């Protein structure tokens, strides 16, 4: 089982907060450090010192870490135009020496769009735009050196784009698509993604989502077409401790009113987290993203590294392999 740290800096974290956690995760043997891409907290109050831009942050982390994989889980397609986004991700991939993972979704949190004047179309149009963005971004990355890329679609038009810079990873950085949508999300994941992620749901719901995406990839002939099957991953909200009191203290942020849908956290001991990871492994997950709630509580990360990672089959520093 491959284990990544997932964080939500929009709840209130500086770049330095994120750097400390990313470096500690790297030293602790976690495979990846991924972060949300939001501009406003889901909680009704708080969030100081405010949001940080995901890709600006990842560019900095790319130069200040050396082994850990870095990415978004996930970027909102409403925030950036596809041409510039392809350039941004490719450049950060170069800056990291080929350690970037590109998570992207439709965007869902209307409140942050209203706050910053970002258009927020109806959900059907957001899916249309996401699909077109995926076609454009992968098309740009697949263009041979010296070639040009054009696209004339319903929402975006590109003409003779130089398709530069090129990402360090070939054919491109791993693409992560996730979410609870039962129809278009599995189809898009099967067509474009290397990894499908269902965030922070219970095991039965996650199993149902995995079944839908596996069926979707089988319908398009994957992996018979030579592409690797999708990596299936789960997200787990984590608040564990050496004592029940310590675990409950770490779970306190979960009681703050939030716009997030209901989640299924692990609140308890390291062995309970190991058991939950095992349950996800039993339904096909080969990667988990552990959401930590407090950037200042680095002892929480140390505890997971010391008492959870050694109990997992793959051990530490497993190499990531995609088709």
Regions found by a protein language model. Name each.
Residues 1-323:
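Active-site-adjacent structural elements that line small-molecule/cofactor binding pockets in enzymes
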């Amino acid at each position: 089982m491959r284990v990544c740290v997932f964080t939500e800096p929009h709840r209130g974290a500086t770049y330095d907060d994120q750097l400390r956690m990313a470096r500690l995760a790297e030293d602790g043997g976690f495979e990846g450090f991924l972060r949300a891409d939001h501009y406003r907290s889901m909680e009704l109050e708080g969030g100081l010192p405010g949001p940080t831009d995901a890709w600006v942050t990842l560019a900095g982390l790319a130069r200040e870490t050396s082994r850990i994989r870095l990415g978004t889980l996930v970027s909102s397609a409403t925030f950036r135009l596809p041409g510039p986004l392809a350039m941004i991700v490719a450049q950060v991939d170069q800056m990291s020496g080929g350690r970037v993972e590109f998570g992207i979704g439709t965007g869902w949190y209307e409140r942050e769009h209203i706050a910053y004047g970002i258009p927020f179309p109806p959900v059907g149009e957001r899916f249309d735009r996401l699909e077109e963005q995926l076609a454009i971004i992968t098309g740009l990355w697949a263009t041979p050196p010296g070639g040009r890329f054009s696209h004339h679609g319903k929402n975006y038009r590109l003409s003779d784009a130089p398709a530069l810079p090129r990402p360090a990873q070939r054919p491109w950085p791993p693409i992560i698509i996730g979410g609870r949508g039962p129809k278009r999300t599995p189809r898009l994941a099967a067509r474009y993604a290397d990894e499908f992620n269902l965030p922070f749901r219970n095991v039965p719901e996650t199993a149902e989502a995995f079944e839908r995406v596996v069926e979707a990839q089988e319908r398009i002939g994957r992996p018979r077409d030579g592409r690797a099957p999708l990596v299936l991953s789960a997200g787990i909200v984590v608040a564990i401790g050496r004592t029940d009191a310590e675990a409950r203290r770490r779970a306190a942020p979960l009681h703050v009113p939030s716009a997030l849908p209901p989640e299924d956290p692990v609140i308890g001991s390291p062995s309970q987290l190991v058991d939950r990871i095992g349950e996800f492994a039993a339904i096909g997950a080969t990667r988990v993203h552990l959401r930590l709630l407090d950037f200042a509580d680095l002892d929480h990360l140390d505890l997971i590294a010391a008492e959870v990672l050694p109990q997992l089959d793959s051990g530490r520093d497993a190499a990531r392999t995609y088709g």
